[in-house]
Amino acid sequence: VGPFEFHDKIPLKRNYKALGIRVVPHAIARYGSFIDKGVIMMPSYVNIGAYIETGTMVDTWATVGSCAQIGKNVHLSGGVGIGGVLEPVQASPVIIEDGCFIGSRCIVVEGVRIETEAVLGANVVITQSTKIIDVTQENPIEYKGIVPARSVVIPGSYTKKFNAGEYNVNCALIIGQRKKS
């Protein structure tokens, strides 16, 4: 294959074996990211300032943005996009707490917090303005910017009126609680 070539202001992280991190080609982590022992990085990208704790899997083509915080034993499935935040200074990082499962092609950005052991099904997109609707009770409960612990979440939509008519808008639906395992 030949040497890996790049040009950047910041070098890439090195010495993965000594750090106790399993890194599969072509995974990349920028210097200034923290990756704990026991993390597995499939071909993926981890930006400066990101923090990833032990036992976490960053699967193929997943990206962990600058300053994002990923807890212990998290699974970031293939193609997941975790947003970063280097600026503006007052912006909050995305936080994925311990034991979460983030399904394939999910996007979590803008300082959203996913609490302990929550599960996001494939293709869930959550921003600060995304309605997260708990539909497990008689009356729905709405959240924004936070997914409660152990929630099981799938993509959904709701109808919204606009001047030009009614249209479906994406949301995230809490459809249950993660079972004990």
Per-segment meaning from a language model:
Residues 21-161, 174:
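Structural signal for interior beta-strand "rungs" in well-ordered beta-sheet cores
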Residues 1-21, 150, 155-181:
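Terminal amphipathic alpha-helical/low-complexity segments used for targeting or macromolecular assembly
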